[in-house]
Design a protein with these regions (language model features):
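Beta1/beta-strand and adjacent pyrophosphate-binding region of the FAD-binding site
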Residues: 2-17, 37
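Glycine-rich FAD pyrophosphate-binding loop
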Residues: 26-53
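Short beta-strand to alpha-helix junction loop
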Residues: 68-75, 116-121, 167-186, 330-341
C-alpha cells in the first residue's frame, strides 16, 4: 500500500465483503481521516441490493471445513454470532444454533483429476471440528458420528438414503442473512463515516498505471486514492479475472408447510449432502428452503469494459460468466434438472413424506464468485496500482461477517498472515479456463470437495431443455 492512510477509499459492492470492510475501516484509527464511499446498484435504495448473494432467508454458519484454517476462522466468527443481545449480531433471531448434519455418499463417482470427493471433505471436516471443540472445552457429545445410512436415518427421522456416513455437529447453525446484512448496514451507516452511492459502476477509470476511480452508469465518475472492488459475482465485469474468479448460479427453492409440519421441521438440524450438494434449512414461518451447493450454472456473455491485466493491454470485449438476476429479467422457472434434483432433496432429507410434490412458492438463483480452490481472492492487483480486490467468496463467505472486514484490511496492509497467503493473487495453471475454446466456454471448477454434481451446466442450455417447470 503506497500510502498507509489514504485520503479516500472507494468500495464497489455492498455485499458482505464490501460492507464489512467499510465497517472495519471506520473502527481503525489509521483510517480516521480517510473518506469512505460505497457504491452499489440497487433499484430500491436498499444496501445491499436484494439480488446480492449475502441477502437471503438463511446462510449456514459452520466451522465444518476440510481446511483447518477455515475451521479456526469460522469458530472465531461464531463467538460473535452466539451473542444474543438485541443489539448483538446473533440477537433477535439473526442466528439460530440448530445443528448441522454433514454427510456424503461412498459412491465411486468419476471426478476430474484434482477434484476432492464429498466424502473426503466430510471426514476431514469432522476431524477438524472435533479438534476445535476439544480445544474450546466443548462436551464430546456435541459432535456425534453417524457412521451409516441407518444412523443418519435415526438422527433425521427419515427412511431414505440421506448419505452413507456423516456426523451431527450441534455447534453449527444458520443465520437469517437478510437480517444480518441489515444489522451490518445499520452499524456502518450509524458511524456517519461512510457515504453510500446508489449507482452501477460501469468501469474502472485509470491514469497511467494507476486505477483512480470508477465511471458510473449515469456518466458520473467517482475518484479515490484506493479502489477496492468487492462486487461479488459481478467482479468479472469490471476486472479481467478469467481463470481466477467466475460467476456461477446456484438454485434454491421454497415450499409452504403447515404449522404442524413446521413444529416438526423446526427441530431438525440443517442437512447437507456434499456428494449431491443438496441441503435443507429449518423453516422460518411457514417456508421451508431446499437448495443445492454445486458447481453451479455458467452464463457466458460478452463484457466490454473489463480492466485488462496490465496497462500495456487494451480493453477489449471478453466473454465471462455473468450473473442473471431479477434486475436482468424474470426467468420464471427452474431448469428441469434442478427442479427434479431439489425435489429429490426434499424426499431424501426431510422426515415428512410428500413435501417433494408441492409447488414452489419461490425460487431463486444465488450467484457465487467462484475460485478453483475455494480460497478467496483478497489482494492488490499485480498489474495496477491503487486497485485492491476482495472477492471469490466461493459460496462460503457470509459466515465470517463478524471478522471478514478486518481480515480484508489486514491483507491490504500486508499483514494477512496465513490467510493473506491463501487469498493472494495466483498464477494460472491453464490459460484456457474461463475462456471460449472452439466455440465452447470452459468454465472454472471449484475442486475443494464441497460441491455436489453436476458440473459444467450452462444456464441458457438447461432452461431450453424440456419439460420446463412453471413456478
Amino acid at each position: 500500500m503506497e500510502n498507509p492512510s489514504p485520503a479516500s477509499i472507494l468500495i464497489i459492492g455492498s455485499g458482505v465483503f464490501g460492507l464489512s470492510t467499510a465497517w472495519a475501516l471506520t473502527k481503525r484509527q489509521q483510517f480516521a481521516d480517510t473518506s469512505i464511499t460505497v457504491v452499489d446498484d440497487t433499484s430500491t435504495g436498499q444496501f445491499p441490493p436484494e439480488d446480492c448473494a449475502s441477502v437471503d432467508s438463511s446462510r449456514i454458519i459452520r466451522p465444518d471445513y476440510a481446511d483447518p484454517d477455515y475451521t479456526a476462522l469460522a469458530a472465531e466468527a461464531q463467538k460473535e454470532w452466539r451473542k444474543q443481545g438485541d443489539d448483538d449480531l446473533g440477537g433477535q433471531g439473526r442466528y439460530n444454533e440448530s445443528g448441522l448434519v454433514l454427510t456424503a455418499y461412498q459412491d465411486s463417482l468419476k471426478l476430474d483429476a484434482g477434484i476432492k470427493s464429498g466424502m473426503y471433505y466430510v471426514k476431514k471436516s469432522w476431524e477438524n471440528c472435533v479438534k476445535v471443540a476439544q480445544r474450546d472445552g466443548e462436551p464430546a457429545d456435541k459432535i456425534k458420528v453417524l457412521g451409516s445410512t441407518e444412523a443418519l436415518n435415526s438422527c433425521l427421522g427419515t427412511n431414505t438414503r440421506p448419505g452413507d456416513w456423516g456426523y451431527l455437529n450441534s455447534l453449527s447453525g444458520w443465520a437469517n442473512a437478510s437480517m444480518g446484512m441489515k444489522w451490518l448496514y445499520n452499524r456502518v451507516n450509524a458511524t456517519g463515516r461512510v457515504s453510500f452511492v446508489n449507482a452501477k459502476a460501469e468501469q474502472l477509470t485509470t491514469e497511467g498505471d494507476k486505477v483512480i476511480g470508477a465511471k458510473l452508469s449515469d456518466g458520473k465518475c467517482l475518484a479515490a486514492d484506493v479502489v477496492l472492488v468487492a462486487a461479488g459475482a459481478w467482479t468479472g465485469e469490471l476486472i479481467d479475472l478469467r481463470g481466477r474468479v467466475e460467476a456461477s448460479g446456484h438454485v434454491l427453492a421454497y415450499i409452504e408447510v403447515s404449522e404442524e409440519e413446521c413444529a416438526v421441521l423446526s427441530k431438525q438440524p440443517i442437512v447437507l449432502n456434499l456428494t449431491s450438494g443438496l441441503f435443507t434449512v429449518p423453516p422460518q414461518g411457514n417456508m421451508l428452503k431446499v437448495a443445492r451447493h454445486s458447481f453451479g450454472y455458467l452464463n457466458p456473455g460478452t463484457v466490454h469494459h473489463a480492466l485488462p491485466l496490465s496497462p500495456s493491454l487494451e480493453r477489449e470485449p471478453i466473454v465471462v460468466s455473468k450473473p442473471y438476476t431479477n434486475r436482468d429479467g424474470i426467468i420464471g422457472r427452474l431448469p428441469h434438472e434442478a427442479d427434479v434434483h431439489l425435489r429429490e432433496g426434499l424426499a431424501k432429507l426431510s422426515p415428512i413424506k410428500g413435501l417433494e410434490d408441492r409447488p414452489w412458492k419461490k425460487t431463486r438463483l444465488c450467484w457465487y464468485s467462484d475460485t478453483k480452490d475455494g480460497d478467496w481472492l483478497v489482494d492488490w492487483h499485480p498489474g495496477w496500482k491503487g486497485l485492491f480486490i476482495a472477492t471469490g467468496d466461493s459460496g462460503h463467505g457470509y459466515k465470517f461477517l463478524p471478522l471478514l472486514g478486518d481480515k480484508v484490511l489486514d491483507c491490504m496492509l500486508g499483514k494477512g498472515g496465513i490467510y493473506g497467503q491463501k487469498w493472494k493473487w495466483k498464477d494460472l495453471e491453464d490459460e484456457s479456463i474461463g475462456r471460449e475454446v472452439d466455440g465452447k466456454f470452459r468454465g472454472l471448477i471449484t475442486m475443494d470437495g464441497s460441491r455436489g454434481l453436476p458440473a459444467g451446466l450452462v444456464l441458457e442450455e438447461e432452461l431450453r431443455r424440456a419439460p420446463p417447470i412453471a413456478v
